[in-house]
Swiss-Prot record:
Recorded family membership: Belongs to the pterin-4-alpha-carbinolamine dehydratase family.
Pfam families: Pterin_4a
UniProt-recorded name of the protein: Putative pterin-4-alpha-carbinolamine dehydratase
GO BP, sorted A to Z: tetrahydrobiopterin biosynthetic process
Length: 96
């Protein structure tokens, strides 16, 4: 699937379309805090399966109960429509 670099207009509306995500340096970033490591790892597992199905993979880190995800598309050197779709799908996985 070919990625399309987002326009300046599309970038300006990212915050309202993606609650919880921040935009900086051509990356979308979001952090989650869970009650414990098992919950954090369970969330990461669900995201991993989703990312694999979408063939678009996040940059992420996990420290105990905190998961941080950053999205960017290296092929276009910035944010693409694929990043938006993955962020929207990840938001649907949120607990609670």
């Amino acid at each position: 699937m070919t990625a399309t670099l987002l326009t300046a207009e599309q970038l300006s509306s990212v915050a309202e379309k993606l609650p919880g995500w921040t935009l900086a340096d051509q990356r979308l970033r979001r952090q989650w805090r869970f009650r414990n490591f098992v919950e954090a790892f369970g969330f990461m597992t669900r995201v991993a399966l989703l990312a694999e199905a979408m063939n678009h993979h996040p940059e992420w880190s996990n420290v105990y109960a905190t998961v941080t995800i950053e999205l960017t598309t290296h092929d276009v050197n910035g944010l693409s429509d694929r990043d938006l779709k993955l962020a929207e799908a990840i938001n649907l996985l949120e607990p609670g």
